A protein has these predicted regions:
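P-loop NTPase motor domains
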Residues: 1-177
């Protein structure tokens, strides 16, 4: 039986526990890569005959972004920041993504970007558009709310943070409402 039971409620986020996995990406490229795969649906991608290039390129780009925002925003970083980051790049013809990643305070973000840079220049914009499309659900108000740290009054009311590292421990259950 479950010993640690959590509730993620996207219908009524005020009744939800919180789950923010972005701060744990800081200085952990392997974890950031796993989170990137989870966020863009790597499991469903593996079950298709589609060209793996696009998904792999999106995953390495998102890995770089997660490492960057986890370093810049630390504990305040939430999944929506990844999409916000892409939108903030605007229409800079001189490749704003490249500038941001090359100047990132995260060495690991820079390394992930170097891998992304292996994609042909002509396809990089399309990769980032596809990535934003997959990240957009994280920008919706309910998703933002359930990934933000709880306020003091919410903690007093019983709201808890879900520790990502507990997910593989027996006895942990998360109910998605």
């Amino acid at each position: 039986s479950a010993k640690r039971i959590f509730r993620l409620d996207l219908n009524d986020p005020t009744k939800s526990d919180r789950w923010n996995f972005i701060p744990k990406c800081r200085n952990d490229p392997a974890f950031a890569c796993q989170v990137a795969g989870m966020m863009i649906g790597i499991e469903s991608r593996r079950k298709t005959n589609a060209d793996p290039f696009w998904g792999d390129a999106e995953q390495i780009a998102l890995t770089a972004i997660l490492l960057h925002i986890a370093e810049v925003y630390r504990e305040k970083a939430i999944p929506a920041f990844a999409a916000d980051f892409l939108i903030s790049l605007g229409e800079d013809g001189k490749d704003a993504f490249a500038k941001a990643m090359e100047n990132s305070p995260s060495l690991y973000a820079k390394q992930a970007y170097l891998a992304f840079r292996q994609a042909p220049i002509q396809t990089r914009g399309s990769i980032l558009i596809g990535l934003y499309n997959k990240l957009r659900p994280f920008t919706l108000a309910p998703a933002r709310m359930v990934t933000m740290p709880p306020m003091a009054e919410e903690i007093e009311a019983g709201c808890r943070n879900i520790d990502f590292s507990n997910l593989r421990k027996p006895g942990t259950a998360i109910y998605l409402v």
